[in-house]
Amino acid sequence: MADQLIRATAADDGIRAVGVITTRLTEDARQRHGLSYVATAALGRTMSAGLLLASSMKQAEARINLRIRGDGPLQGILVDAGLDGTVRGYVTNPGVELPPNAKGKLDVGGAVGKGFLYVIRDMGYGYPYSSTVELVSGEIGEDVTHYLVTSEQTPSALALGVFVGAQGVTASGGLLIQVLPKAAEDPALVELLESRLAHLQGFTPLLQAGKTLPDIFTDLLGDMGLKIFPQTQMVQFQCRCSTERVLGALKMLGQDELLDMIEKDDGAEATCDFCGEVYQVTSDQLGKLIDDLKTEAGA
């Protein structure tokens, strides 16, 4: 099944539902960064969460950043996701591996540890909004749910999952259900929804069983006036790095540092943290940056 994002509503638009499949893009990230099993699960969950949160933004260029900093061996996760369906991300320590947790699952919580989740929403207006919440478990899903309830004050349920085996990632994605104020006033409806979500046995087992996103929506909300939007949005791992951005970053180092690179290394090499792309910068390109800096200083 192709990586995709689908939106739906229920209960006369009082319930908002978004589902995303990220199997291929998570495998792409695993290969790019040489991720271990647990690092793949951690990054895959966070990328799915980023896409789900970005799906409710309005402006075409809107993006959301999720940064997780913990005291576990993984150290940190950074994900950048957009309303346009693109996402990128990396972990600080991609090679970390841990024994399974008490449930026999990949120990993402142990890899992340205790710490904080930082969320930056760039709504597309040039004025980003930031929030910080303490990690609840380090399992990503519970932590992002905690953010939604405390910072956005929206009752939410988030299911995230990544299954990675010897052949790579075979299932990855997530589901976000939000109860809007209109539906939150109906305690019976909220209780029914909570009961069904409590019996949801993970997200990736549903994908492995052949369930599609519409199937999952129907199982949960089919008798609540479910309306699935006809548009299916494709999602993908896509970085925004470029030679121009690399040159711009190098230029900020100043003339002395650039000259030192020319004299000692006859150029420079830069690697994008988000996607692993390696950029070779020649001494001529560095010299051009120095000339630009001199011209700007003279102006």
From Swiss-Prot:
SS bond list: C239-C241, C272-C275
GO MF entries: protein folding chaperone; unfolded protein binding
Cellular component aspect of the GO annotation: cytoplasm
Keyword DNA repair: no
Coiled-coil ranges from the UniProt annotation: none
Keywords, in A-Z order: Chaperone, Cytoplasm, Disulfide bond, Redox-active center, Zinc
Post-translational modification summary for this protein: Under oxidizing conditions two disulfide bonds are formed involving the reactive cysteines. Under reducing conditions zinc is bound to the reactive cysteines and the protein is inactive.
Statement: the UniProt record of this protein carries the keyword Transcription: no
Cited CDD domains: Hsp33
Compartment annotation: Cytoplasm
Family matches, as InterPro entries: Heat_shock_Hsp33, Heat_shock_Hsp33_C, Heat_shock_Hsp33_N
Gene3D superfamilies linked to this entry: Hsp33 domain, HSP33 redox switch-like
Alphabetical GO biological process terms: protein refolding
Function per UniProt: Redox regulated molecular chaperone. Protects both thermally unfolding and oxidatively damaged proteins from irreversible aggregation. Plays an important role in the bacterial defense system toward oxidative stress.
Family, similarity comment: Belongs to the HSP33 family.
UniProt name for this protein: 33 kDa chaperonin
UniProt gene name: hslO
